[in-house]
Amino acid sequence: MSRRYFGTDGIRGRANGLITPELAMKVGQAAGLVFQRGEHRHRVVIGKDTRLSGYMIEYALVAGFTSVGMDVLLLGPMPTPAVAMLTKSMRADLGVMISASHNLFEDNGIKMFGPRGFKLSDEVEKKIEKLLDENLDKKLAQSRNLGRARRIDGVHDRYIEFAKRTLPRELSLEGLRVVVDCAHGAAYKVVPEALWELGADVVPIGVEPDGLNINKECGSTAPEALCRKVREMRGDIGIALDGDADRVIIVDERGHVVDGDQLLAVIAESWKEDGRLTKPGIVATVMSNLGLERFLKDRDLSLVRTPVGDRYVLEQMLKQGYNLGGEQSGHIILSDYATTGDGFVSALQVLAVVQKLGRPVSQVCHKFEPLPQILKNFRYRNGKPLDRAEVKSAITAGEKRLNGHGRLLVRSSGTEPVIRVMGEGDDRILVEEVVDTIVSALGNPAVA
């Protein structure tokens, strides 16, 4: 069965394009029916980021869930990992996050978590998809069995305490000037407050959401503003989150960016020294730099690679017993603490290493020299460009040229009509030639 609605991270698209009130209500009904298990009163928790369309989608979901007899607990703007944590903590049958993550405000999405706080499996998503294409009128609850909805107070404090408990009680961030960019998104209240409670001198930016400015020239996908602010304020470290705070990028005191691969190296080395790794290795995706793999190998640690998407990273972590994994983009999963990527908790682990070593972030967080890596995106309108003969031929030729000297990865995005062409190797000129040849075969200029 093909997937019409769900991508690699829930349902995502243009607000009032794909993501309409009608679809959101139907998603609430379908998911509510799938998760009505047992005879108890069923409940769902719903959080959101700060997009203007979040109001529309939130109320449509409420209508859908209550119409099939599920009670709804509304959390308001909260990080995605907080929604996952609260789903389990509040004994809910289902958790929902309204967000398009790092996308701009025009887009929105619906991602869901099961009762244990994990993202839904492909199998469960297919069950929901099947119901989305059916007439559900005869499956609605009787009038006396409709669900109720109410807003929950104090959820910010719950997440702050959860995040703080991931650090040793005796560890303080006193003496650190931390510049944090919340991308005008879901973390704009909780993260600056939590850092202040831990003793840091906090300089917050990206904390003035207006519904339209989420991720706009800020956050983990546009860290330039944070780099400038760190240098301007003489910060010790910068933390950039994305709109729903499930990914993080670090900036050192010189204003240089530290990506997810480097953060995985920092945490992996520290956890190995402390005996905290459950297995001698970590899980990352096919996008992670070969430099990370070599760094880990030198320390007798393995790197298990998965397809792109934090859900696939977590799947392998659970299957093989690893407790650390993540993506170059900044999705870091620490399964000792969380069931999904948590940008803030990951940043806290890095801050703990910085405090423990007492050295500048530039010395702590640049663990290896990354191999030259070229990534270009080709946006298309329709069709299947990767099925064309000339594209297949260009990919095969590129793989032969890089054989033994690097890697080539060509894949379709799971969330937008984009083909990503990534090459890496010791010879930057060769890598760029290979990538450009494939992009040319795809037919249009690429967007770097």
UniProtKB/Swiss-Prot annotation:
SUPFAM superfamilies in the record: Phosphoglucomutase, C-terminal domain, Phosphoglucomutase, first 3 domains
Example of a GO biological process term: peptidoglycan biosynthetic process
Record flagged with keyword Zinc: no
Residues carrying Phosphoserine: 101
Record's GO cellular component terms: cytosol
Cofactor note text: Binds 1 Mg(2+) ion per subunit.
Protein name (database record): Phosphoglucosamine mutase
Organism: Nitrobacter winogradskyi (strain ATCC 25391 / DSM 10237 / CIP 104748 / NCIMB 11846 / Nb-255)
